């Protein structure tokens, strides 16, 4: 009888210890400060007639963008501060195809050896760019949104709003003309 009492008492004490440990862990995790950085999807808006074959913002890749396209897809994930700080900047790198629809006019059969050789020559005309730009103030963070503008200009925002809505910093027309001289 003493063995049964001792083993059931031991079981109750173990359960009590586990409950106290769990309560302590939950209490400690509830007291942690909020994170200073948040993950943010990356999306892009191409306001030019060129294609943006690939781009990255602060090392996080974004979707490829056809001429005058964007906002339709996101790639995960970049990182943004929970709260905007003065001097916040983004490094944007991208590859641009100035004539994205030229292959449609080629006489070569698509993906043939001749077509692949021509595509290799075409890719030599792609240009690569890098810009460091300021991220304007935002009240609540959102996606990292990159706007590609004529003359190889870019703008980046992490605002919690979208193009066309009040408070969005870059409401450019989707189709912008490239000036003759930049």
Annotate each language-model stretch with its function.
Residues 32-39:
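Bacterial lipoprotein signal-peptidase II cleavage site
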Residues 55-101:
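Tryptophan-paired
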Residues 22-25, 70-71, 145, 176:
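Processing junctions and N-termini across compartments
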Residues 2-19:
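Bacterial N-terminal signal peptides that target proteins for export
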Residues 33, 78-79, 153:
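Disulfide-rich extracellular modules and peptides
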Residues 42-50:
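Structural motif
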Residues 96-182:
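Beta-strand-rich cores of mature extracytoplasmic or soluble domains
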Residues 26-30:
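C-terminal motif of bacterial Sec signal peptides marking the signal peptidase cleavage site
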């Amino acid at each position: 009888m003493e063995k049964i009492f001792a083993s059931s008492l031991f079981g109750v004490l173990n359960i009590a210890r586990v409950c106290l440990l769990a309560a302590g862990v939950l209490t400690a995790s509830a007291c942690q400060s909020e994170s200073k950085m948040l993950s943010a999807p990356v999306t892009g808006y191409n306001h030019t007639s060129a294609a943006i074959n690939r781009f990255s913002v602060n090392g996080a890749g974004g979707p490829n963008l056809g001429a005058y396209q964007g906002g339709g897809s996101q790639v995960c994930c970049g990182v943004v501060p929970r709260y905007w700080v003065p001097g916040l900047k983004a490094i944007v790198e991208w590859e641009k195809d100035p004539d994205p629809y030229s292959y449609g006019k080629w006489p070569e059969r698509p993906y043939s050896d001749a077509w692949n050789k021509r595509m290799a020559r075409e890719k030599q005309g792609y240009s690569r760019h890098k810009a460091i730009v300021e991220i304007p103030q935002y009240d609540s963070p959102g996606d990292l949104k990159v706007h590609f503008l004529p003359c190889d200009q870019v703008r980046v925002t992490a605002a919690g709003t979208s193009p066309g809505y009040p408070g969005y910093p870059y409401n450019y027309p989707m189709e912008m003309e490239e000036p003759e001289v930049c």
